[in-house]
From Swiss-Prot:
Phylogenetic placement of the source organism: Viruses, Varidnaviria, Bamfordvirae, Nucleocytoviricota, Megaviricetes
Annotated GO MF terms: acetyltransferase activity
UniProt-listed Enzyme Commission number(s): 2.3.1.-
Enzyme class: transferase
Alphabetized Gene3D superfamilies for the sequence: 3.30.2140.20
Organism: Acanthamoeba polyphaga mimivirus (APMV)
Entry keywords, A to Z: Acyltransferase, Transferase
Family of the protein in this entry: Belongs to the arylamine N-acetyltransferase family.
Catalytic site: 52 (acyl-thioester intermediate), 89, 104
Name of the protein this chain belongs to: Uncharacterized acetyltransferase R151
Amino acid sequence: MSNLSSLKKLMVGFLSRHNFSNRDYFSGETYLRTFDHYTIIDKVYTTKYGICMELNYVFHIILTNHHIPNYLVKCHKKKSNGDFYDLFHLAIIVELDGSKYFIDVGFGEHFIEPVELNHNSITGNIKVIFNQLENTNISTYDISTNNILILRVTDEPLNNIKHIESNYQKFFHSKPEEFPLCRVLFERKFDAKTNQYIPLVPDYQYIKKANY
């Protein structure tokens, strides 16, 4: 089995056992408000669900324990007005056999296998566009499907857990008009037999109403 095949197997195995869910935002639970290494690992393994920061952080640990070079990265979703949300989505970049791959086990849709990060590369129905930020050594990748931008990935390792903690706190204190995931209960499980995400609740079931 190739290294890429092994990586995909790990990813599918994790997706199959852990659902994406933002239910904790609506539940009022308080013990989850601190992004602590052991608390997050225990939470994900116990409940078998989580949001991007929880799921991708735990999978990052799993990859590291398997001696697979990887690092956490910030990604941003685009608003309808063209700006990007301040809250970032957490994901992973893996370095394998001289190539980079985008890994996301905490989105709840689209991502079912490692996505090769090369300019104009296509993995399944995911297309990647490479960008170099002017006057910096930082690069970004625009990840889209059907010509719709899903995420802008900043290729810069996020090594400080305090930065994730700050974003985590910001998410749980955000209002519905400030971030899409704070408006609806969104829960998905991954079916490895069909390679599809299955909704656990009706899509876009509104829990909190806001003017946005």
